[in-house]
Amino acid sequence: MPSKQYRVDRLAQEIQKDVDEILLKRVRDPRVQNVTITGVDVTGDLQQATIYYSILSDLASDAEKAQAGLDKATGLIRSELGARLNIFKTPEIKFVRDPSVAYGSRIDQLINDLHKKEK
């Protein structure tokens, strides 16, 4: 008997793939053009999905615009997911900016600063 976690992980992968495709092909909002889906967390009961994203720009105004665009497109994305996924109830989705990308950039910057000081 397959574990429940396997199903949750498989659904998270499917949601990530489908949301990425929906953003590319169906959502026409220019605020979400530079958005990349980096991960999805689905609750054990498959009722909620947190979708993590990153953007190319480091500007706070661009991050706010991207969040507003994703919030506006949530209904369309959820209905498209409902048509694509073979599950009883489509999970509620929430978009959250992925903090690991900014953290990684900060670490790179600190390492580069150390190398410059050594020279």
Swiss-Prot record:
PROSITE patterns: RBFA. One of its GO terms (cellular component) is cytosol. It is found in: Cytoplasm. SUPFAM superfamilies: Ribosome-binding factor A, RbfA (SSF89919). One of its GO terms (biological process) is maturation of SSU-rRNA. It holds the Pfam family RBFA. Keywords: Cytoplasm, Ribosome biogenesis. GO terms for molecular function: ribosomal small subunit binding. Gene3D superfamilies: 3.30.300.20. Monomer. Binds 30S ribosomal subunits, but not 50S ribosomal subunits or 70S ribosomes. Belongs to the RbfA family. One of several proteins that assist in the late maturation steps of the functional core of the 30S ribosomal subunit. Associates with free 30S ribosomal subunits (but not with 30S subunits that are part of 70S ribosomes or polysomes). Required for efficient processing of 16S rRNA. May interact with the 5'-terminal helix region of 16S rRNA. This is Ribosome-binding factor A. The lineage of its organism: Bacteria, Bacillati, Bacillota, Bacilli, Lactobacillales.
